[in-house]
């Protein structure tokens, strides 16, 4: 787990980090964050419970417990990742563990949307490319540089042309995915608009 977690804000154009591989198809949201952790009042503590049951069963051998994966921030997965229930706790748990981007063969649609909403880009690659990365990463740590504008990931002598929905890409590059920051940056325009709307004015005169 990354002890220096900071929530992403604004424009996202570049992501650099160490990869962590999670091998297996159809890894669902209940495995990512078990249902008993959904009762939390806030998302602050869900990062430490990510893959709780899988990690307990593997007794320290789960990728998220290996020393070599400490402070990893780019998750490499296989197909249909994030399937199952639509719980937004799943991407929140991954983000608060330290994940900043996910590269996989395919993603469940709702999980993908939930990731985009909190600033986690999800990229796809062909099966062979994913397997090549996972195989390489099994032997030594792989550090990737992701250029979101070019949809390109590179590391040493490796280059991968990533695929991402154009609408999602535009939101990250412009910062539009982050509604709060967008509102704060345009506070003056919002105030002016409010002042121009007659139905927002009220009077106590009867």
Regions found by a protein language model. Name each.
Residues 1-206:
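Fe-S-dependent hydro-lyases/dehydratases of central metabolism
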